Amino acid sequence: MADIIETPVSRRLSTVKNIIIVLSGKGGVGKSSSSVQLALSLLAQSPTNRVGLIDLDITGPSLPRMVGLDTPTATVHQSSAGWVPVYVDQGRRLGVMSIGFLLKDRGDSVVWRGPKKDGMIRQFLSEVRWGDLDYLVIDTPPGTSDEHISLLTHLHPLFTPTMSNATTPTSILISTPQTTALNDTLKSLSFTRKLSLPVMGLVENMAGYVCPCCGEISDTFGKGGGEAMAHKEGVGFLGRVPIDTVLVSLLDAVSKGEVLGEGAVEHTSDEAAEGQTNGSTEHFPLLDKYLETTSSKVWKDITQKLVDKIEQHKSDIRARLESSSETLAIA
């Protein structure tokens, strides 16, 4: 079995155990907030987990604001080993990379054609010093555009697993229950199949509104459409997430700097700048506040299902590689 083709991207990401690409067929379905919740839920699974979060929406970056890093102090540092992501917490367990950190004015628009976007995406993948990561979550723009093609082109060498490294990029789909959103989700699913990107499942977001007064659930955008589509298309259904007013208030507070306070973590040494951590479990305000929401409990179950599916996917790959090796040996 051939080894993974070595490229600047494959070398840089060799210390990343799992890559999860978050996709949606259309905008406004809560994909970016889902990416943030997935990252936080992965961190909550273990105090030693380290997660990276890439904002691949070049023309409309939103992750810095969602994690409380939309501040002048949140800037990308250059270390001896490459760009350094901006860390959300003192323990440097959650690092974020976004073009939003590179703009002189956070209100500036990014008017780029495909080739320039491709160059930035390549830099995000090959020049960011993540260190050892358990998970790298990549939040993509809605639809299927230049960004998606560039991403999968640069990740292509990682689609050739070996016995020593069965990790390949995987993805999840985010949709709301309405027919329009689901139709666009089918297009994203078709895209993943054409490019052989494994889909671990679908999340039905905004699936009901929980009244904060009486607790009654109203199916504002319909119900069950995502689950029905997932079953029909043979895609795992990971769960449905209702609208959580507490989460909305939390994200608003985070964007105003009322949760993190000081904002981005300052890098005081080259070791710290390169993302090294001693595995400490220091105070993590954003994670602590998030775990108080109803959404965190829903995403806990979704994340566990996703992790189980990823591990099964890797196990299946190893089994196929072993079977192939045995066949070649007999021949």
Curated annotation (Swiss-Prot):
Domain of life assignment: Eukaryota
Positions annotated to bind [4Fe-4S] cluster: C211, C214
CDD domains: Mrp_NBP35
A GO term for molecular function: ATP hydrolysis activity
UniProt keyword annotations, A-Z: 4Fe-4S, ATP-binding, Cytoplasm, Iron, Iron-sulfur, Metal-binding, Nucleotide-binding
Cofactor note: Binds 4 [4Fe-4S] clusters per heterotetramer. Contains two stable clusters in the N-termini of NBP35 and two labile, bridging clusters between subunits of the NBP35-CFD1 heterotetramer.
Coiled coil: none
GO terms for cellular component: cytosol; cytosolic [4Fe-4S] assembly scaffold complex
Endpoints of the signal sequence: none
Family: Belongs to the Mrp/NBP35 ATP-binding proteins family. NUBP2/CFD1 subfamily.
Annotated protein name in UniProt: Cytosolic Fe-S cluster assembly factor CFD1
Native source species: Cryptococcus neoformans var. neoformans serotype D (strain JEC21 / ATCC MYA-565) (Filobasidiella neoformans)
